Amino acid sequence: MRRAVLEILEERIIHNVKEIHRFSGKRIIAVVKANAYGIGVREVSRILEGLEEVDAFAVACTQEGVELRECGIKKKILILGGILEEDVKLLEEYDLTPVISDPEHLKVLKDRNIKFHVKYDTGMGRLGFTNEIIKDPRVEGVMSHFSSPADRNFSKLQIKRFEEILKNYEKVKYIHLESSAGLIYRVPFTTHVRVGLAIYGEKPLKDYPLEVKPALRLRARLISVKELPENYPVSYGRTYITKRKTKLGVVAFGYADGLMKTLSNRSFLIFEGRKVPIIGNITMDMTMVDLSGTEARTGDWVYIVNEERSFTPLARDAGTIPYEIMCNLSRRVERLVIKKR
């Protein structure tokens, strides 16, 4: 039985990539780390590989880069999350491009003929050099990262700092700063944009100017539908007591599949376009919903995410960010690419 399916809408992925390219005027470094934000790196990267707007991919570690190569990706692959001595052999064998953000990373490369990008910390307080200029013919690109793109004043300060640093680098092929949210700044001196979330149609900011479309549908099966009497408890801890006779649906999707427990008693799923409230505590493998007034039957599909409600508002209900919910989608969820017609 298919318990849960994440549908990846190829046509919308392609639309979103073209919209990002149209808006920015730049080619894209597609961020597909963490299994493409939980969506499915093999499925997503194979769509993106064939798009001329996508110039390169970015992942967190060498192991993720190796996985991309093994599923047939030929384009450039950046390793964003640092390297150690043990990574060098894989960098060479799989033609991976490291991002250098610490003096020790440079020592690891020694005299190896491996091109790399240099990362600068312009206000993120995480990875990156601050003022050090790397004079090395192997430098192929320079990058930085916004810490809070919604804060326009601080983001403009980061842009200014990055521009000053770039005065020390001439003729580098790749200069990248803008993320999905950072696209709004249209930084004039970058060559590429480094984007993940917007590819899937999630809007990282209110009043987002790009016309991206939700490209994901997450659905799960009803494995039981039954009537409960008034004043009857639902799920662990009896945090919900029925207020009337209730048609209870048990959905084969729980926190082990990626639905955060914080959504218990405070959000909804979608059945045939109708919002059905989550009632009681979400459990490891199941979620209970109130199906009263519907014709739902065991075996029907209920949507967690679709064109009506993307991961972003779902995350808002959970008190988190869409990245966290997406990255928590487990391997029990089947990934299915819906091909462009």
UniProtKB/Swiss-Prot annotation:
Record pathway: Amino-acid biosynthesis; D-alanine biosynthesis; D-alanine from L-alanine: step 1/1
Function text: Catalyzes the interconversion of L-alanine and D-alanine.
Annotated keywords: Isomerase, Pyridoxal phosphate
Active site: 33, 236
HAMAP family: Ala_racemase
EC numbers, comma separated: 5.1.1.1
Origin superkingdom: Bacteria
CC cofactor: pyridoxal 5'-phosphate
Note: Strong thermostability.
Gene this protein is translated from: alr
Official protein name in the record: Alanine racemase
